[in-house]
């Protein structure tokens, strides 16, 4: 199944999978259905390039959702961030509409997009950066990890 996912080319500026393709990755779909904070945390860690851990991002999502029911709004912010990083067409209104109509579909679409771009979502940012470095930096479609400030 994973080989098929990576083999599908997608148009520049477009999502690699459709909004309603949740069941193309049944495992992630079930995880997201039962506990969306896990999928959100995995996505946020990659999008934030490791500045926030999966656990911290997932816990914050869950806390925001439990206290204010605005977890979807928080996830919306990450859709925009991800679109900007990968030059995917869209706008904030569409992101919000997707998350408010079907948060499950929106989160799984983000997860699949990162997976299609070469990320192993179970490794997190640091694991993927190390994997890329060990493979000579050519296997992943992710931006290279930037170190601290230099002169």
Curated annotation (Swiss-Prot):
The conditions that induce or repress this protein are given as: Up-regulated in shoots by cadmium.
Let me know which tissues express this protein, per UniProt: Expressed in aerial part, but not in roots. Detected in the guard and mesophyll cells.
Quote the InterPro entries the UniProt record gives: PLAC_motif_containing (IPR006461)
Transmembrane segments annotated in the record for this chain: 31-47, 54-71
Predominant subcellular localization, coarse grouping:
membrane
Give the domain section of the comments. the N-terminal domain (1-84) is required for cadmium resistance.
What PANTHER family has UniProt attached to this entry? DUF614 FAMILY PROTEIN-RELATED
Provide the family line: Belongs to the cornifelin family.
Q: What is this protein called?
A: Protein PLANT CADMIUM RESISTANCE 1
What organism does the record attribute this protein to? Arabidopsis thaliana (Mouse-ear cress)
Designated gene of the protein: PCR1
């Amino acid at each position: 199944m994973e080989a098929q996912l990576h083999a599908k080319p997608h148009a520049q500026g477009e999502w690699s999978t459709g909004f309603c393709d949740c069941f193309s990755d049944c495992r992630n779909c079930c995880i997201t259905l039962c506990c969306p904070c896990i999928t959100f945390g995995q996505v946020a860690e990659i999008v934030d390039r490791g500045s926030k851990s999966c656990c911290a991002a997932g816990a914050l999502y869950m806390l925001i959702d439990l206290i204010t029911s605005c977890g979807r709004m928080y996830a919306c912010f990450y859709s925009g961030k991800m679109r900007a990083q990968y030059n995917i067409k869209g706008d904030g209104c569409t992101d919000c509409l997707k998350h408010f109509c079907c948060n499950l579909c929106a989160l799984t679409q983000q997860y699949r997009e990162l997976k299609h771009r070469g990320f192993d979502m179970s490794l997190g940012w640091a694991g993927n950066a190390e994997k890329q470095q060990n493979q000579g930096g050519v296997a992943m479609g992710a931006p290279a990890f930037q170190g601290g400030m230099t002169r």
